[in-house]
């Protein structure tokens, strides 16, 4: 299996009138809404992937450090999980 790149990005999550807004500070256009915290984060990750692909086509960097991700890599991340009251 070949090595892949992973970006560790800060994602800010806020409540808004329609649900939740997730955004990546420092990455223009990287924001998305969702009805839940998880959906907003998932949608924002999709937007980041589109921005990364566009910038790669133009030979531009995403502006964040990439981590080589392979069979020997382990990464611990914190993900928000919405709790229903």
Q: Residue locations for each model-derived region?
A:
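Short aromatic-glycine-(Arg/Gly/Cys) micro-motifs in beta-strand/loop hairpins
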Residues: 12-27
């Amino acid at each position: 299996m070949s090595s892949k790149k992973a970006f560790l990005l800060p994602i800010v999550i806020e409540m808004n009138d329609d649900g939740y807004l997730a955004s990546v500070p420092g990455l223009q256009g990287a924001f998305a809404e969702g009805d839940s915290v998880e959906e907003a984060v998932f949608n924002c990750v999709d937007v980041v992937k589109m921005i990364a692909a566009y910038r790669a086509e133009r030979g531009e960097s995403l502006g964040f450090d990439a981590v080589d991700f392979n069979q020997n890599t382990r990464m611990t991340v914190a993900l928000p999980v919405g709790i229903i009251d």
